[in-house]
C-alpha cells in the first residue's frame, strides 16, 4: 500500500538541508545519511549520497530514473553468499 497522494512524498528535513547546501555549493562531495526512508527528489539528481545499510555507508549516485524511489532501495541490507554446496561428492 502506497502513501496517500494528499500527504505528498517524504524526505527527512536534515537530509533536505544537506542537499540544498550541496546544490548551492560549487564543490560536490558525498552526503552521508541514515535516512533510508527518504524519497528521492528531482534536485537530488547528480549527487552522491552514502546510504547506511546497517554496517557501512553505500555510495549511491542518483540518476533521473531513480526519482520517486526511496534511498533504501539502492543500498541492500542483506548479503547473499549462496546456498551450501552439495556434499555428495565428498561423502564417497
From Swiss-Prot:
GO cellular component: cytoplasm; small ribosomal subunit
InterPro entries reported in the protein's UniProt record: Ribosomal_uS19 (IPR002222), Ribosomal_uS19_bac-type (IPR005732), Ribosomal_uS19_CS (IPR020934), Ribosomal_uS19_SF (IPR023575)
Keyword Secreted: no
Keyword vocabulary terms for this entry: Ribonucleoprotein, Ribosomal protein, RNA-binding, rRNA-binding
A GO term for molecular function: rRNA binding
Pfam family, one: Ribosomal_S19
Role this protein plays: Protein S19 forms a complex with S13 that binds strongly to the 16S ribosomal RNA.
Similarity comment: Belongs to the universal ribosomal protein uS19 family.
Name of this protein: Small ribosomal subunit protein uS19
